[in-house]
Amino acid sequence: MTEETGNDFQMVQGYEIVPSNEEAHAEEVQGDELVLAEDLAQGDEVQVNGLVSAEMSTPPTSRRRRKKSLVWEHFTIEAVSGGATRACCKLCKQTFAYSSGSKIAGTSHLKRHITLGSCPIIKNQEHKLALTPAVGTDNDGEGTVERPSKRRYRYTGYANAAFDQDRSCSYLAKMIILHDYPLHIVQQPAFTTFIDSLQPRFRVVDVETMEGEVYAVYQKEKENLMQAFSTMPGRISLTIGLWTTSQTLGYVSLAGQFIDSEWKIHRRMLNFMMVSSPHSENALSEAISTSLSDWNMKDKLFTITLDNDCSSHDIYSANLRDYLSNKNNLMLKGQLFVVRCYAHILNAVAQDVIASIHGVIYNIRESIKFIKASPSREEKFAEIALQLEIPSTKTLCLDVTTQWNTTYLMLLAALDYKQAFSTLETSDDNYNEAPSAEDWKKVEAACNYLKLLYDSAHSIMAAANPTSNLFFHEAWKLQLELSNATGHEDPVFSSIAKDMHERFDKYWKDCNLVLAIAVVMDPRFKMKLVEFSYSKIYGVEAAKYVKVVDDAVHELYKEYVAQPLPLTPAYVEQGDGNNAPASENGTQATAPSTGDGLVDFDMYLSEIATSQPTKSELEQYLDESLTPRIQEFDILNWWKLNTLKFPTLSRMARDILAIPMSMVSSGNSIFSAGTGTRMLDDYRSSLRPEIVEALVCAKDWLQYLPATPEAPSTTLVKVDAP
């Protein structure tokens, strides 16, 4: 009910008559700029906890009624051309249609602008809304009195979301997991004070309880991952990493890489298990077997990838192959089972190069330290470089000893300034670290070969999620370059090349088969690149090595043919309903005659189909012309589109392309892999093994989830406002 009195009027709101003048309005918002969703009017419907209720009606009156919806506290009416009017938001000044002639648009769209956070001003100031009833003051400002409760409707966005202790604890656990915070952060006074300032009702738990929260997050995410694995269409390949601690214990990390039904490649941490002797043969085999049992994937293991940390790699390989072949159905009799990490071999070869000239590198480091010791020395060195007309724009800087790429860049820059170093030594009695001419030749040779490794590493890092086919291109070129470099006429160059080739050649012999099979699954190259590259590497003996690859591809394909072909919904939906069904030998079965008098002709076609040999999917794939090479070629999408054409071969391609040729995951530096023993810090070493595993695994899993939690409900709920 309203009574018009000059510019003042009163409005029935719930059970209370609220004055509409400025003083009353200021009291209603209690110092905040906004009151959200207080837009009830006569006959307006409001959703309350999912239900729709109507505001009580007022008796009819003969007098012209003023606009009573509380929407008009936030909007003004502005006339526009054509006799129409528009509602203008007082906060953001955005206008909305209101009336045109005798037609009135209503206020529902205006309510949505206010209540659903569409107004940018409301959205930015939503955090100002109090969660708890405010305490007001009397008119004189003396003392405090509790204002009478008023029934009103408020927007239930983040600011008014109901507090949930359990949910908040779970988010805190996820924060600790994702950011590697120590569990005892919950005991730190500054943290508890900060949390209390945000939400006084939140009870900060102790360390033991937080361990339980972390483990609960781990268990929940593990269940989700296990469910995903249960529908995984292909096999899984593992990467194995060894960790040590300051104690006598060690850990084994196991990550799985696979391609899902949408032909997207994924890598997920599976286990981070404590073992008493991680470098022992049996301990590693048992850890892998335990992990496979834990994840119900004993029959889905395809390959494992190990680092190159040690001379015991061959022992590991043989032991793992023997141990797991008795428990799992290994493809191709285990010939592809153990793969060596490409990133680790690159780094191992690079470290050999650096070690071969460590004396020269020491002098260059000391020289750079001398120059960088004071601005005057830097200026003097710059003047010398200018006088010598050295065109280089490279900056001298020290390397990071654990990242060989920085050492390479340091040597490359120093090589440009070699004359400046010599001149500085003759002009400054305090400097006597300049490398000799023979030293610079060693640096030149080292940079020449480090560039091969550097470029190869960058080619791999350029791919966000590199599939196995990419690695053959890098490996065969590097094998050829190093093999040719061993015959360099300069003994300095040939000496370094021989050491590099000796190490890389072993990797090539161990892994060229799996590398070659992977590139055969690339429709741009197939067997052709294998034939070409082997002719460069092996010369007249190339045919023998090409045959090994060809035989292995055909034998592996036969093993997939022997397996049942799953009839997935994708096959049914994508298949051409007009095609005749295929017979068991791969020929197209002929549909029976429909009374057209050609029964004998049908029999003739059937005899031809059974008597003539048909091509297998593999032979058809290899015989087809190569797919054009384009820069942005997506091999996984190609196989996805050709799954119906090659149903069996595509299953084989899925497993092969998912082999992790490198243990370095996307986003991590390839240049520091394998440069030292991975050590678990003292803090994590002090935790219980199951908590360590929960922290490591859950961190990996959580990074693939949406960054923000699901927004609270945006319904209107009735609350008692202060």
Curated annotation (Swiss-Prot):
Q: Which InterPro entries match?
A: hAT-like_transposase_RNase-H, HATC_C_dom, RNaseH-like_sf, Znf_BED, ZnF_BED_domain_contain, Znf_C2H2_sf
* SMART domains noted in UniProt: ZnF_BED
User: In residue numbers, where are the BED-type zinc fingers?
Assistant: 66-134
What is a single molecular function from GO for this protein?
zinc ion binding
Name residues in a coiled coil. none
Among PROSITE patterns, the record links this protein to: ZF_BED
Q: Where found, per UniProt?
A: Nucleus
The alphabetized UniProt keywords are: DNA-binding, Metal-binding, Nucleus, Transcription, Transcription regulation, Zinc, Zinc-finger
Q: Where does Zn(2+) bind?
A: 89, 92, 113, 127
Q: What happens when the gene is disrupted?
A: Reduced plant size and amount of seeds.
Main location group: nucleus
Q: Outline the segment boundaries, as ranges, of region: Disordered.
A: 572-592
- The ranges of region (HATC (Hobo-Ac-Tam3) domain) come to 617-702
| Keyword presence, Zinc-finger | yes
For this chain's UniProt record, which GO biological process terms are given? post-embryonic development
SUPFAM superfamilies referenced in this protein's UniProt entry, alphabetically: beta-beta-alpha zinc fingers, Ribonuclease H-like
Q: Which Pfam families match?
A: Dimer_Tnp_hAT (PF05699), hAT-like_RNase-H (PF14372)
Q: How does it assemble?
A: Homodimer.
Please give the PANTHER family that the UniProt record associates with this protein. Answer: ZINC FINGER BED DOMAIN-CONTAINING PROTEIN 39 (PTHR46481:SF10), ZINC FINGER BED DOMAIN-CONTAINING PROTEIN 4 (PTHR46481)
Job description of the protein? Transposase-like protein that is essential for plant growth and development. May regulate global gene expression by recruiting other cellular factors.
Q: What is this protein called?
A: Zinc finger BED domain-containing protein RICESLEEPER 2
Q: Which organism is it from?
A: Oryza sativa subsp. japonica (Rice)
